[in-house]
Amino acid sequence: MKFIYFFICSSVGLLYSQDIVVTESNMIKVTYEHHTHYSPLGNYDTYLYLTDGLSQYVKTQKEKIVKPAWNYEYKMNFVKNINNFNFLTGAIEENRTLKDSTLLYAKWNVSDLIWTITDEEKTINGYNVRKATTDSFELEIDDPFYYNKAIAWFTTDIPIPVGPARYYGLPGLIVELEYERGSLRYVLKDIDFQAHYKFIEINKENEVDKYDVIYYDHKNPKLIKNIQKQNKKNKNKK
């Protein structure tokens, strides 16, 4: 606990720009198991790395076919997202890599998230947690599969304002994230306080709206197709 407190306080004097490159060093690594909609066979791990006021969330998944026991199969889409959160300035940046290797960049601020912290408490995996809710943003609000509210269970035992899936800004680490609709959720699996990791540098080319990296089918699909075409031309020139 003292280590975590020092980790945060030592960052106060390090207000820096978003153009940060973090080299390999000791840091905190938080592993979340991502529970998918249809079957535990589709579950996979996502990772959150933290050092001196900055976190990097890494979510990657190869395209694959999952066949649950009842002989139904579904395709898991390709996913590769790198998301940085500067929890001293509130700045968020993300790179999304598409299946054809096109790289997209978006930036926004944690102030876009409006949390309601409730009095509801419970214990998850030994952590005392409190419930908070906010509007989910993975799908458009008029989408028939919209998740409604995102529900975060966070612990002030680890007073770091981060969590999985771009949900930041609470006064403690998110231990579990779920939604009002659907079975999608993220569950804390492990915390390594002496991890070694080199932050992946964010590429700021091809800047788009944040929902072009968040929505799987993008907010501006025509723009994305044009970027992909240009990316292909650039590859062919090499």
Segments predicted by a language model, with ranges:
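Bacterial Sec-dependent N-terminal signal peptides
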Residues: 1-25
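Extended soluble regions of mature proteins
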Residues: 19-238
